[in-house]
């Protein structure tokens, strides 16, 4: 193990006084126990680092400012103005790539070699062109199926079809021919997002959003042409499509993304569909016996004022106890129901936990202060339009979402591709906190590990960076655990609240974490770190953050600081997992 240390290179404009060791009177140390698993898929040098900042704060770093919509579960930088984001395809009311504006005068001299190493190895992406929402996931006859919004003609949004891929392990994927194309009047402007339902008799129902020749969003039905085909190569659209149209009072561009169906006590199937009334996000409930004719419930499943259009809704149960997933139709005292909506206004996936009342077909959140669009998120980075499915093969619920890059449209055209899917995650109820979900990469990803490098009892003093010699690798699965020295009776944690100040916002404990995608001079790097703060009640709050501001030297890439509060219970250590193929973080 290399025990040498070096100072954290200061941000441009940072006072060099604070880039090295703090005064001796302010020095503290903490212990980091790190286990780094390296899967070498192709050669590229990368240095693994652990970082801890001393308690000083540079004078040019502003403290975290919370706006009037701030909630303790999330933090965003003051420079982030999601309300001004303009996604591609906005006029058509669909989810598409959205980035805060980057000056047209900024550009970077990208090369093909640079673009090639940006292709991922852990994450699914097509061979070329544009991809967005995951659609209709299911397990059938030994194969996991992933459908996805796909433009076969270009690396930007448009001409949306359903791409199709299959896998036996959720990691290695086989590309298949396009499953459905925009070839009918009711989906002439796009075969948009939808969901699969496996029926007890073995039938498969696929409901999707069609955008008609007149730009009206409708729900359409399709089914496999040959159920004996495990690859489900061919799909047939129902001759009576569309099966649902926007109800009275709903705009024709605000009715989309039917969910997986579930059964009620009367034996009828239910689905929910996202919409809005003025600025109130809502989810309609429809009943059906044959998936061809429907009746709308008198009320709505749920509504939250001020959240705007709800799209890509997901609705499913999670067991209060145990480590297994729950089939979508289960509803009893042993489960809670998750309602998730992708907010079109902000391009954020929010979820909430609550109770589903079958008698009036409404869902009520456990905590109104953490309602859909207000509190919890699946993810605080680039993540949208997520979808779960129940994997009957391993009795688990699997979650997947869409990640779009923060570069420009011209970069996408130069690369020839855009967007990836997240690593599939299992979803469970956190019965320790009782207030949130636990997400974890599926176990199959561990099969990609080729070499293990183990570091333990690494002592890191305040204001230092410790280099860990992991050899040559480009794909890493990093597990790191930190143990902090206990506070002395006279000490308090005086860090700024949240993640907004970034990795140079220093407190008594923190930030501490790891640096990934770092060059030798530490001028280009991405800190993934914990930060501690005091609550108004005097308790210690833990935040898990990522600081992208020095993640790339390219000026035409949007960079931000993001993160959220994470529960760390008494007696637990600070644990993080980072998949360094795309850089995805999980903390607890």
From Swiss-Prot:
Segments in the Lumenal topological domain: 53-588
Skewed-composition ranges (Polar residues): 73-84
Cysteine pairs bridged by disulfides in the record: 499-545
Positions of substrate binding: 130-133, 149, 157, 192-193, 256-257, 311, 344
Subcellular location, principal: membrane
E.C. number(s) listed in UniProt: 3.2.1.26
GO terms for cellular component: membrane; vacuolar lumen
Substrates-to-products reaction catalysed: Hydrolysis of terminal non-reducing beta-D-fructofuranoside residues in beta-D-fructofuranosides
GO biological process, one term: carbohydrate metabolic process
Tissues expressing this chain: Expressed in buds, stems, roots and leaves. Expressed in the epidermal cells of young leaves and of primordial leaves.
Annotated region described as Disordered, given as residue ranges: 57-86
Function: Acidic vacuolar invertase involved in light-induced bud burst.
Name this polypeptide is given: Acid beta-fructofuranosidase 1, vacuolar
Species assigned in the record: Rosa hybrid cultivar
């Amino acid at each position: 193990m290399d025990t040498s240390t070096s100072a954290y290179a200061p941000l441009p404009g940072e006072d060099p006084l604070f880039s090295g060791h703090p005064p001796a009177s302010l020095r503290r140390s903490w212990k980091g126990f790190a286990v780094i698993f390296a899967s070498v898929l192709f050669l590229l040098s990368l240095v693994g680092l652990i970082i801890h900042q001393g308690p000083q704060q540079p004078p040019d770093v502003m403290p975290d400012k919370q706006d009037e919509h701030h909630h303790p579960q999330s933090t965003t930088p003051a420079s982030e103005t999601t309300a001004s984001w303009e996604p591609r395809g906005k006029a058509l009311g669909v989810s598409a790539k959205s980035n805060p504006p980057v000056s047209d005068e900024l550009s970077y001299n990208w090369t093909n070699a640079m673009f090639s190493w940006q292709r991922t190895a852990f994450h699914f992406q097509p061979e070329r062109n544009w991809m967005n929402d995951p659609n209709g996931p299911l397990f059938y006859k030994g194969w996991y199926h992933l459908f996805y919004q796909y433009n076969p003609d270009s690396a930007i949004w448009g001409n949306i079809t359903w791409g199709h891929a299959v896998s036996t392990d959720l990691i290695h994927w086989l590309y298949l021919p396009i499953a459905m194309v925009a070839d009918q009047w009711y989906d002439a402007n796009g075969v948009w997002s939808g969901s699969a339902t496996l029926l007890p008799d073995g039938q498969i129902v696929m409901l999707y959003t069609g955008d008609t020749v007149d730009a009206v969003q409708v729900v359409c039905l399709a089914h496999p042409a040959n159920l004996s085909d495990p690859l489900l190569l061919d799909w047939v659209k129902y001759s009576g499509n569309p099966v649902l149209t926007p109800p009275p009072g709903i705009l024709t561009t605000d009715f989309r993304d039917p969910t997986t169906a579930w059964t009620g006590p009367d034996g009828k199937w239910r689905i929910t569909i996202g919409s809005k009334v003025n600025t109130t996000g809502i989810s309609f409930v429809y009943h059906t016996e044959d998936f061809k004719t429907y009746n709308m419930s008198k009320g709505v499943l749920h509504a939250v004022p001020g959240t705007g259009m709800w799209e890509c809704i997901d609705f499913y149960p999670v067991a209060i106890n145990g480590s297994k997933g729950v089939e979508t139709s289960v509803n009893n005292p042993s489960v809670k129901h998750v309602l998730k909506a992708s907010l079109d206004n902000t391009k954020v996936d929010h979820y909430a936990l609550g109770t589903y009342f079958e008698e009036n077909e409404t869902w009520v959140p456990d905590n109104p202060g953490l309602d859909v669009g207000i509190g919890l998120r699946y993810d605080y980075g680039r993540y949208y339009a997520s979808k779960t499915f129940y994997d009957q093969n391993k009795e688990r619920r699997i979650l997947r979402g869409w990640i779009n890059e923060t570069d420009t449209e011209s970069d996408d055209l130069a690369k020839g591709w855009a967007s990836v899917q997240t690593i599939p995650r299992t979803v469970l109820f956190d019965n320790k906190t009782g207030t949130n979900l636990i997400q974890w990469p599926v176990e199959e990803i561990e099969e990609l590990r080729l070499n293990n490098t183990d570091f333990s009892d690494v002592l890191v003093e305040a204001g230092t960076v410790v280099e860990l010699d992991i050899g040559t690798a480009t794909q890493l699965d990093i597990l790191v655990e930190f143990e902090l020295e206990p506070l002395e009776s006279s000490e308090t944690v005086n860090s700024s609240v949240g993640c907004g100040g970034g990795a140079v916002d220093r407190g008594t404990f923190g930030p501490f974490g790891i640096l990934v995608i770092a060059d030798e001079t530490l001028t280009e790097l991405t800190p993934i770190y914990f930060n501690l703060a005091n609550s108004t009640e005097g308790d210690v709050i833990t935040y898990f953050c990522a600081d992208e501001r020095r993640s790339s030297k390219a000026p035409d890439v949007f960079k931000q600081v993001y993160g959220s509060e994470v529960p760390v219970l008494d007696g637990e250590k600070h644990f993080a997992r980072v998949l360094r193929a795309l850089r995805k973080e999980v903390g607890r």
